[in-house]
Curated annotation (Swiss-Prot):
GO terms for cellular component: plasma membrane. It holds the Pfam family ABC_tran. Probably part of the ABC transporter complex YxeMNO that could be involved in amino-acid import. May transport S-methylcysteine. Responsible for energy coupling to the transport system. One of its GO terms (molecular function) is ABC-type amino acid transporter activity. The keyword Ubl conjugation does not apply. The lineage of its organism: Bacteria, Bacillati, Bacillota, Bacilli, Bacillales. Belongs to the ABC transporter superfamily. This is Probable amino-acid import ATP-binding protein YxeO. Residues 2-239 form the ABC transporter domain. Induction: More strongly expressed in the presence of methionine than in the presence of sulfate. InterPro entries: AAA+_ATPase, ABC_ATPase_HisP-typ, ABC_transporter-like_ATP-bd, ABC_transporter-like_CS, MetN_ABC_transporter-like, P-loop_NTPase.
Amino acid sequence: MITVKNIRKAFKDLVVLDGIDLEVKRGEVVAIIGPSGSGKSTLLRCLNLLERPDQGLIEIGEAKLNAEKFTRKEAHRLRQQTAMVFQNYNLFKNKTALQNITEALIVAQHKPRDEAKRIGMEILKQVGLEHKADSYPITMSGGQQQRIGIARALAVNPHAILLDEPTSALDPELVTGVLQVIKSIAEKQTTMIIVTHEMAFAKEVADQVIFMADGHIIEQGTPEELFDHPKNERTKRFIKQVGEPAELI
């Protein structure tokens, strides 16, 4: 489904990703945790070329790309395999919730407007916001805007959804609603890679958890393996510092 081999990314002299290898199976949910500056978000952005890796191989679905040399067509095909959910929502302020969802369906996938609207309304219902179809982002809470961002990603039916700290910009009382939407999507066997600082959420929802630090994958395993029985000392220190994951409400 997703295979990443020897991905490296540096910003001038600062190495952010150093030889990252990763495999994600179809229908699997992978949570990436770690301290700030560990390269988590950069890894996600490299997967859909929002950041161009300096080297390495990326394979998502039927799209393959060599980071050192690729064509515009190869880049376009790789980007089509994923949809991104950003921490700051990235909605079009001048478009309604429904229009934000249907934009990519009409412009990128060339679907008829009636079909795009039907898909958009189905997805809005899935995230519990069908009553907000004609509302603009300015009239919605941060949690509602993020759910629209998730709906937009779902609508294009990607091979995988990449979520970059989807709750980090939300007020605490809005976090649970967004996490519950993501959990419901995970239960439908949607392939997802989630960068998160919500440890309880990662433990409950993920099939695999990856701990990153200093541009490396330090340890990975099932939630039980990584949170309850970490092997690496760096992982143990991190888990101790952030606290044991509580149960997701």
